[in-house]
């Protein structure tokens, strides 16, 4: 992992490296499987000593030459730094050992959240209910705040999507999770692999093969999530990289050098059908003028023109949010 410029005090996390799986299961009782993340299974569990309900993420990864699963350890390192923020899921503990096959097993112990944004949106869609406008606003404010915190610490998430945004149904608290693909970024920008992100929330520069990208990739994802909160439907639902680009171009207009200088030099650029841009207000119903303005600023083609998460928090759309609560 690249060096982080903004080192913060690490959250207190105890690490156990002896006893392996047996030891972890002595401490926690699995209650139910609640999902599978990109890199492992997630269980709702009870800490035997305290009765506290936690989320237990079991990760078994191929090891590198040094015997360390790099993706999981990257996630741990980032979470230790980012856990201090109320909008990033808190890493409580870490257990490491080996299973019977000699593979490294990591149990990451997180605070438990009872749902995620994907389930929350799906429940409203199935009930034919729109998410209330004030709820959309407080969820979006928390998302922008969490992303701004990560970016301020030099971390790109790179896989923001409703499934990775955990929620508390009662309080409407929202927390960013699944930092397994995150990267610290430095200046000048590094070349990054573009085999990342769920297609629907993937920024156009990544789809077009850009090797250099930065925080605006997360902002594009935030904009897609914003539109989905307003409509209960994904804004760009492609099933391949080409289809995803065509969905975007059809709605926002096919980009050119005037709109996005350098776009035709990107590796995956071809001659695409020419579509004229639609108004965002025609695409996303249920948002007021301030909300539409913010959404437009998030979905700019040229990455450098996208609003930052920090600036988004200061947008007039959030003027009536009680920021002390979040």
UniProtKB/Swiss-Prot annotation:
Could you list this entry's UniProt keywords, alphabetically sorted: ATP-binding, Cell cycle, Cell division, Cytoplasm, Cytoskeleton, Kinase, Mitosis, Nucleotide-binding, Nucleus, Phosphoprotein, Serine/threonine-protein kinase, Transferase
SMART domains, sorted: S_TKc
Q: Which residues bind ATP?
A: 34-42, 57
Upregulation details from the record are: By cytokinin, gibberellin (GA3) and submergence. Down-regulated by the replication blocking agent hydroxyurea.
Which positions are catalytic residues? 159
| Segments forming domain Protein kinase | 28-318
List, alphabetically, the GO terms of the cellular component aspect.
cyclin-dependent protein kinase holoenzyme complex; cytoplasm; nucleus; phragmoplast; spindle
Question: So what does this thing catalyse?
Answer: L-seryl-[protein] + ATP = O-phospho-L-seryl-[protein] + ADP + H(+); L-threonyl-[protein] + ATP = O-phospho-L-threonyl-[protein] + ADP + H(+); [DNA-directed RNA polymerase] + ATP = phospho-[DNA-directed RNA polymerase] + ADP + H(+)
In the record, biological process GO terms are: cell division; G1/S transition of mitotic cell cycle; regulation of G2/M transition of mitotic cell cycle; regulation of gene expression; signal transduction
This chain's function reads:
Forms a complex with CYCB2-1 or CYCB2-2 that activates CDK kinase in tobacco BY2 cells during G2/M (mitosis) phases. May be involved in the regulation of the cell cycle at the G2/M transition.
UniProt-recorded name of the protein: Cyclin-dependent kinase B2-1
In the record, what lineage is assigned to the organism producing the protein?
Answer: Eukaryota, Viridiplantae, Streptophyta, Embryophyta, Tracheophyta
């Amino acid at each position: 992992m690249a060096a982080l410029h903004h080192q913060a005090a690490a959250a207190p996390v105890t690490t156990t490296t002896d006893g392996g799986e047996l030891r972890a299961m002595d401490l926690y009782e699995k209650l139910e499987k609640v999902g599978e993340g990109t890199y492992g299974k997630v269980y709702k569990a009870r800490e035997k000593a305290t009765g506290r309900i936690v989320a237990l993420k079991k990760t078994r990864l191929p090891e590198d030459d040094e015997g360390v699963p790099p993706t999981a350890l990257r996630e741990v390192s980032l979470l230790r730094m980012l856990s201090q923020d109320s909008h990033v899921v808190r890493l409580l503990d870490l257990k490491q050992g080996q299973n019977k096959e000699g593979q490294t097993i990591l149990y990451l112990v997180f605070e438990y959240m009872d749902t995620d944004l994907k389930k929350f949106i799906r429940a409203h869609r199935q009930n034919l209910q729109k998410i209330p406008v004030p709820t959309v606003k407080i969820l979006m404010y928390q998302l922008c705040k969490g992303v701004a915190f990560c970016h301020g610490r030099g971390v790109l998430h790179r896989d923001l999507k409703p499934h990775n945004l955990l929620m508390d149904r009662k309080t409407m608290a929202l927390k960013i999770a699944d930092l397994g693909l995150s990267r610290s970024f430095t200046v000048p920008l590094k070349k990054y692999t573009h085999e990342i992100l769920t297609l629907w929330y993937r920024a156009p520069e990544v789809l077009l093969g850009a090797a250099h990208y930065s925080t605006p990739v997360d902002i594009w994802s935030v904009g897609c999530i914003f539109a989905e909160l307003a409509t209960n439907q994904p804004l760009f639902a492609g099933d391949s990289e080409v289809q995803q680009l065509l969905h975007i171009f059809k709605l926002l207009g096919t980009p050119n050098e005037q709109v996005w200088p350098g776009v035709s030099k990107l590796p995956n650029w071809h001659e695409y059908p020419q579509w004229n841009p639609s108004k965002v207000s025609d695409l996303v119903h249920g948002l007021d003028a301030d909300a539409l303005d913010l959404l437009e600023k998030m979905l700019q083609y040229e990455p450098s023109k996208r609003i930052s998460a920090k600036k988004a928090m200061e947008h007039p759309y959030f003027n009536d949010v009680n920021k002390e609560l979040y």
